[in-house]
Structure formats: structure tokens, C-alpha cells
Regions:
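Polar low-complexity intrinsically disordered regions
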Residues: 1-3, 58, 84, 102-103
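Short, Gly/Pro- and small/polar-rich lid/capping loops
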Residues: 1-18
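Glutamate identity and glutamate-enriched acidic tracts
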Residues: 7, 27-30, 53, 58-62, ...
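A short linear-motif detector with a strong N-terminal bias
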Residues: 13-17, 60-64, 106-108, 116-117
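Intrinsically disordered, low-complexity, positively charged segments
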Residues: 21-71
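Phosphate-centric recognition/catalysis
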Residues: 67-129
Length: 129
């Protein structure tokens, strides 16, 4: 496996999960945790576009496991994930609290046709595909 690290990013492989972290963002590690998965042998798609065929239960289960593995690698709580249903729009929503209690906020109507999320809450972990 080729190391993709350079002057801007660090390529990390931890517990079988590969991800990138930006050196500049790491300067704010006291207030920000970030990771950009390489998606190598991983499936982070919890839904398909509204015009496409829905994903299978098995695909959804695999995506959830892959998100959980990534969260474990960066020492974050998988249940704190909030992920929009992207549709290549200009829509961005603010997230103030979780909708679900004991599972991530995936595929929720609240985030239909939303391509970005913002928050200032420390217990909300934002994700996209």
C-alpha cells in the first residue's frame, strides 16, 4: 500500500482502516476531529439517490460497520454520526441535536436533499458520502 502522506495530509492506517487527516486541521485537535476515508474496500453509502434503486439491507449493514470501524479508528462514538441524504443541491442544514437515540442519524427525512451539515455541538459527528 502506497503512503499518500505529503506536506498537506497524513495517510493513516489503523485497525485496517485507511484515512487522511489534514496537517493544518490537526493544529485544532483540541476542538476538531476529522478523517477522510479513502473508501478502499469500504462502503460508506447508506442510501442511493432517490431516482436509483435502494440499497439492500446487507449493503446498509456493511456501510454501518464501515462507519463504526472508522469511528473506532479516530476514537469517536459511532452513535454520534449524522449524515445527510446528498442530492447535489445547494442545501446545507444546521444540526443542533440527534434525532435517533441509540443509533446514528442515517437516511432521515430531516436530511433529504441536503448536501452539507454544520454544527457547533461537540457530541455531533458529521459525515458525508
Amino acid at each position: 500500500m502506497k503512503d499518500l502522506s505529503n506536506e498537506n495530509v497524513i495517510h493513516i492506517v489503523k485497525d485496517g482502516v485507511q484515512y487522511l487527516q489534514f496537517r493544518r486541521l490537526l493544529e485544532y485537535s483540541d476542538i476538531l476531529v476529522h478523517a477522510y476515508s479513502l473508501g478502499i474496500d469500504k462502503n460508506f453509502r447508506t442510501a442511493r439517490a432517490k431516482t436509483a434503486e435502494p440499497i439492500t439491507k446487507e449493503e446498509f449493514k456493511e456501510a454501518n460497520k464501515d462507519y463504526a470501524d472508522l469511528c473506532n479508528a479516530i476514537e469517536m462514538n459511532y452513535i454520534d454520526l449524522v449524515k445527510p441524504n446528498q442530492a447535489h443541491t445547494k442545501n446545507v442544514k444546521k444540526v443542533d441535536e440527534h434525532v435517533n437515540i441509540n443509533k446514528p442519524d442515517f437516511n432521515l427525512k430531516e436530511y433529504d436533499l441536503t448536501d452539507g451539515l454544520i454544527t457547533n455541538k461537540s457530541n455531533i459527528l458529521l459525515a458525508t458520502t
